[in-house]
A protein has these predicted regions:
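Interfacial segments of multi-pass membrane proteins
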Residues: 172, 177-191, 269-295, 356-369
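Membrane-helix boundary/helix-loop-helix interface segments in multi-pass membrane proteins
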Residues: 2-6, 28-165, 344-357, 363, ...
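Hydrophobic alpha-helical segments of polytopic membrane proteins
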Residues: 71-77, 149-160, 168-208, 214, ...
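Hydrophobic, glycine- and aromatic-enriched re-entrant/interface helices and adjoining loop segments
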Residues: 103, 194-296
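Hydrophobic alpha-helical transmembrane segments
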Residues: 46-54, 292-313
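Alpha-helical transmembrane segments of multi-pass membrane proteins
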Residues: 13-27, 55, 82-86, 127, ...
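Loop-to-helix entry and N-terminal half of a specific, functionally important transmembrane alpha helix
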Residues: 314-355
Length: 387
């Protein structure tokens, strides 16, 4: 039995695109930091090649053996322990960003444990939900009691990630995965809706507990309010309208970069907003930088590649006879989909920016390797299905 070649090729093409733009978009960053011109390119090339090899070697494992289960549980436990100890590591062993330690330094590279934790979490939920949730109809109270232990643990673990790493984006993704996979496992729509309500309430509490987040939400709403206020009654307009608002610097230049690229772009390597105007253009704002250079047409091609990859994973999931494999593949597809849209909507101000990487495109080894582990597992599972 062979793994699915289409998924492997689609993933490899996206990785290659990410490698190319790690060189093009980092032109100013390497000068500013005093690095060699090929610093980010060589590192991303190494991440990409090793990621493809990870996919290939994992795909050779038999998914019906205990090895798959042991590897995924080990990934979950090791990454979870790393997340716990990360805030207590000395500065020479941990890299900080946004006022919080998020990476563990291992020689010349830094590892973000939360990226690997998400993959382990998806497998654990697939395995555990299969044992606890079935397709039989139950009263909403019974379903809540089944899901309650997961919610309690999720609030504790995800809350710890949010507090210690100040990373709302990863927390939102993790909570979404827990709810969505419960639905895929057989939970009712009522339970899913109930979970969304609870998650929304928790989200509001988190946002309004921080003045900085209130200001970010206010700035975001101020940028898009003109599209919605005409549909609101006058009394509501008076309440929600933001009178004084300044467009965030990064979002402003992100939108300008996209507009400057037009339909066909300025040409590979010819973007100007990467030259100090738009920071983090090779990481969080990679889609804006790419669009400036290859235009909306080029961006559309990338979106189509992503869509084909995600649909392929869903197709593999739909053909799985093993329920654990079905839920796991669905979780990987949802992770890719949700991460892509969180970033894409954030850089054009449709949603608040959360600093979530674009899978396979954004510069960084942790995101690359974790996604390649997930894709390798899907490829491994694809050997057991008829496509």
């Amino acid at each position: 039995m062979f793994a699915d070649k289409k998924l492997f090729y689609l993933s490899s093409i996206l990785i290659t695109i990410g490698i190319v733009f790690s060189y093009s978009l980092s032109a100013f960053t390497v000068l500013y930091l005093g690095y060699d011109d090929f610093h980010f390119f060589i590192r991303q090339l190494a991440f990409g090649i090793s990621g493809i090899l990870i996919m290939f070697f994992i795909s050779q494992i038999n998914p019906d053996t205990a090895l798959f289960h042991k590897l995924m549980i080990a990934l979950l436990l090791i990454s979870f322990i790393a997340i716990i100890i990360l805030p207590f590591l000395p500065a020479n062993l941990a890299t900080a960003s946004g006022g919080a330690k998020r990476w563990i330094r291992l020689g010349p590279i830094s590892i973000s444990p939360v990226e690997f934790f998400k993959i382990g979490l998806i497998y654990f939920l697939a395995w555990s939900y299969t044992r606890r949730i079935d397709d039989s109809k139950k009263a909403i109270k019974s379903e809540i009691l089944i899901l309650l232990p997961y919610m309690i643990v999720a609030i504790i673990v995800i809350g710890y990630i949010y507090i210690t790493q100040n990373d709302l984006g990863q927390s939102v993704i993790s909570f979404f995965i827990i709810l969505a996979l419960a639905f895929f496992a057989g939970a009712s729509k009522k339970l899913f809706a109930f979970g969304l309500v609870i998650a929304t309430m928790i989200g509001f509490l988190v946002i309004f507990s921080s003045q900085r987040r209130i200001e970010r939400i206010s700035n975001w709403w101020g940028n898009i309010q003109d599209a919605f206020l005409p549909f609101f009654p006058d009394w509501l307009v008076q309440i929600v309208k933001v009178s004084s608002n300044s467009e965030p610097y990064q979002i402003s230049h992100s939108l300008n970069a996209i507009a400057h690229g037009g339909f066909f772009g300025e040409g590979l390597g010819l973007g100007i907003f990467k030259l100090g105007f738009l920071s983090e253009v090779h990481t969080d704002f990679v889609l804006a930088g790419i669009t400036e250079e290859i235009g909306l047409v080029g961006l559309a091609v990338i979106c189509i590649l992503y869509l084909l990859m995600i649909l392929r994973i869903f197709k593999i999931a739909g053909r799985c006879e093993n329920k654990v494999h079905f839920i796991f593949c669905s979780g990987v597809a949802l992770l890719l989909l949700f991460s892509f849209f969180m970033n894409a909507f954030g850089i054009i101000s449709l949603t608040p920016l959360k600093g979530v990487a674009v899978p396979l495109l954004s510069y960084g080894g942790s995101s690359m390797w974790s996604i390649c582990i997930a894709l390798g597992c899907v490829l491994m599972i694809s050997k057991k299905v008829k496509l």
